[in-house]
Structures are given as C-alpha cells and as structure tokens.
Amino acid sequence: MTNQKQETKLWGGRFAEKTAELVELFNASVGFDQRLAEQDIRGSLAHVAMLGGQGILTAEEVSQITDGLNGVLADIRAGNFEWRLDREDVHMNVEAALRDRIGPVAGKLHTARSRNDQVAVDFRLFTKEAALDLAEQTRALRRVMLAEAEKHLQNEVILPGYTHLQVAQPILLAHWFMAYVAMLERDEGRFRDAAERMDESPLGSSALAGTPWPLDRHATAEALGFARPTANSLDGVGSRDFALEFLSACAILSAHLSRLSEELILYSTFEFGFITLPDSHTTGSSIMPQKKNPDVSELARGKAGRVFGNLMALLTVVKGTPLAYNKDLQEDKEGVFDSYDTLSIVLRLYAEMLPKTVWHADVTKAAAARGYSTATDVADYLARQGVPFREAHEVVGGLVGLASRSDRQLWELTDAELKAAHPLLSAEVAQKLTVEESVRSRQSYGGTAPERVREAVEAAKEKLRQETGQP
C-alpha cells in the first residue's frame, strides 16, 4: 500500500483545496475493500458490455475498456497491482489504473453509474457468494456429524443427557450428534435463504434516483448471475439488510458451534473423561508438560463473540442512516469479511477434528448411570400402573432424597425401602430400570430409542441425497 503525492481526484472538479492528509487517511477504505477487486471488475465488465449493447458506447470503446479491465484484473491476481491510499477505495484504484493503461477512454466506463450502485453490486456479489460458500461448508460438517451418529449408533453408545449441566436422562451418543445435524441443517438453510433474498442486482440504480440513460438492468443482472435487478433505486443503493441477514445467519451458526465447543471442552477434561481429542487439533503448555489443551474448541467458542459483535456493529451503523447512501455504510464490509473468514476456518476445523475424536463408551455409560438419571423412568413406571404422575413424581423425589443422603443409587435401595415409598415398587422393579432400558423406552418420534435414532439417521441421509443429487 502506498500513499503517493495526491493526484487530481476523479471527483475533484468542484473543490478548490486538496484533501487534508488526515482526511485522506480517515476516508480511505482501500486497505480492506480491495478484497472486492474481482467483484468490482466483474461489475464493470458487465456494465461496459451493456453500455455497448445499448449503443451508449461504441464497439471500439467497449473493446478498449474490456481489454483494459482484464489487464488490471490480471495484475491484481498476479500481485503486481499498486494499491494507493490516495485513491481512496477499490473502485477509484481500479478506474485510475484503467486510465493509466488505456487513457481518457477509461472515463467512459462510469457513464450512467455511481460509486453508490457500484459498491452495492460489488458487496452483494461478495456476500451472496460468501453465503453460498458457508452453506456448502455447513453441509459438509453436517455430513460429518451424520457419519459420526451412524458410527456410534452401531454400538449404541450411551451418553448422559444434561439439563442445567446436571445429569438428567441417558441418551444415545448418536442422538446427541443428530441434535447438531438438525441445528446445522437450519443454519445451512438460513444461508441459502439469505442468498436467495440478496439475489438482486442494484447496478443501474446510479446515485439513488436511477438514470436518464437507456440502460438494460436486466442484462447486467443476468451477466452477473443475479436473478433480477432491484426494483427500487433508493433501496438498491441504500439498503444493507442483505449484509445484516448474512451476519445474523453467521451469528446463529456461531452460537451453535460455540455450544458444541463448550461441550467438547468439558467432555475432554479429566473430570469428565468422555473424549480424547486428537493431538493434531490440540496444543501444549510452555511450562506444564502434561497439558493437552483444546485450543481449537476454545478459539471457536471465543470467536463467536466477535461474530456476534460484527452483527451488532452493523445494526448500529444502519439504524441511524437516512436514505439513500451515507459514508457510514463504508463500515459494512469488514464485519462481513471477518465473520466469513472466521466461520470458514471453524467449520473446516471441526470437519477435520470430529472424526478423529475418540469417545470412551465405558466412561460415558457409567456417567449416564450416575445422578439418578433413571428417576423419571421409575415415575413413568408408577404412572403406567395408574398412579397419577404428580404423585409418582413426589414418591420418586423422596426416594432420590433417601438415596442421596446415604450415597446410594436407586437400584441400591432395599426392597423394604422401596415398598415403604410405594407398594407398587420393589427391588426387582428397580433393578430393571437400567440406562439401556431407559434409552430403549424413549420410543416417541424424535426420541433417543435406537429405532427412532436409526430412522432419524436414514431420513437425514435421504434428505442429503435429495439436496445434492448424490448417492
């Protein structure tokens, strides 16, 4: 990045003074919006082709500008492009480089176009492509989660299910994985829905009111891969809800990945001991040689905060901007870039890490048996015998209190103690209420019984086949 002696601004005709150096520094966005260079040149190529098609530019002018733009693009891709701070942004840098390459005819590129619709189309292109890319990466992780569910379903690995981080009821590990499959399916859908809504081209809206030039906005929209042009020029250049929706989808996905991260961090501790994370995705301590730190999950959990912040930042920017374009909207891009980059790496890391994570089935099963996780099953047993559930709940609550005071499990209570609580209970009944039986009994649709989880796995696999057209 260079900051050369100021040249005449492309917009400088009405100004008598040069821009102050501090204003140059404060005003410039090229340090980050150069990331839109490819989208900017694609938009310009579509625009100049349309100008030629409408007879606004001659064929020779279109050819010169097109060749020049392709040359600038080649320089950018090769890393030979000089980005200049005094040229403010990606648009002015590209146009000035085009002028340096082909001369004054470059000035005709901006016919019937404003930087307002130019940046809007660039940013929509980027955000739409980012949404579709994150949708694909989310689907890839969803597929990994589904494969893990199917793998652990084979041995019906049991895991404690928690509420309030207290052991609640036993579940299948496959059921736990399928919960994340469901979350990721919705996350993917949010990105695809957002991409569909932002599939409109603002190019041709000009500054805000449209243009007297006979443009073909449908042609440029089609050339850029949009479904249609935006229907209102004010909305086209002044709205950033497409970026807000993208950031919202990013934030919700980040929340889900943060919850996953929190569970994996807990489960990998000595105190839980449920999993062993792969060496390839953990780190050590500079002083404690025994440490194996879950840095991937901790960073994924921590980075959720910045993704949330990106959404809140843009909401705060947009809320006070009157129609149409305001310089405030320069602040729309960095958060989108950052959220996209952050989630892209987190999704790929988890797709790598989860298949290499080892689950200790004996430990998870033993943990599921602790904490009176089958207490609800005892209450359900009484209810099936005709005891009102609220009465059954109170009876079993008393038994849990008795067992906890003597540091025993429910099945360790004596026959006399059980019958004293309720005549329908006995040691024989309590011994049958195992975690395996508890899991098998959860036969309701969406429940954790092996048959129900197997159905859910097959349904999820079929849905993926339908979505992708792949076996």
UniProtKB/Swiss-Prot annotation:
The keyword Amino-acid biosynthesis applies. InterPro entries: Arg_succ_lyase_C, Argininosuccinate_lyase, Fumarase/histidase_N, Fumarate_lyase_CS, Fumarate_lyase_fam, Fumarate_lyase_N, L-Aspartase-like. GO terms for molecular function: argininosuccinate lyase activity. It holds the Pfam family Lyase_1. Keywords: Amino-acid biosynthesis, Arginine biosynthesis, Cytoplasm, Lyase. CDD domains: Argininosuccinate_lyase. Disulfide bonds: none annotated. It is an enzyme of class 4 (lyase). Gene3D superfamilies: Fumarase/aspartase (C-terminal domain), Fumarase/aspartase (Central domain), Fumarase/aspartase (N-terminal domain). It catalyses: 2-(N(omega)-L-arginino)succinate = fumarate + L-arginine. Its EC number is 4.3.2.1. It is found in: Cytoplasm. GO terms for biological process: arginine biosynthetic process via ornithine; L-arginine biosynthetic process. GO terms for cellular component: cytosol. Pathway: Amino-acid biosynthesis; L-arginine biosynthesis; L-arginine from L-ornithine and carbamoyl phosphate: step 3/3. Belongs to the lyase 1 family. Argininosuccinate lyase subfamily. This is Argininosuccinate lyase. It comes from Deinococcus radiodurans (strain ATCC 13939 / DSM 20539 / JCM 16871 / CCUG 27074 / LMG 4051 / NBRC 15346 / NCIMB 9279 / VKM B-1422 / R1). The gene is argH.
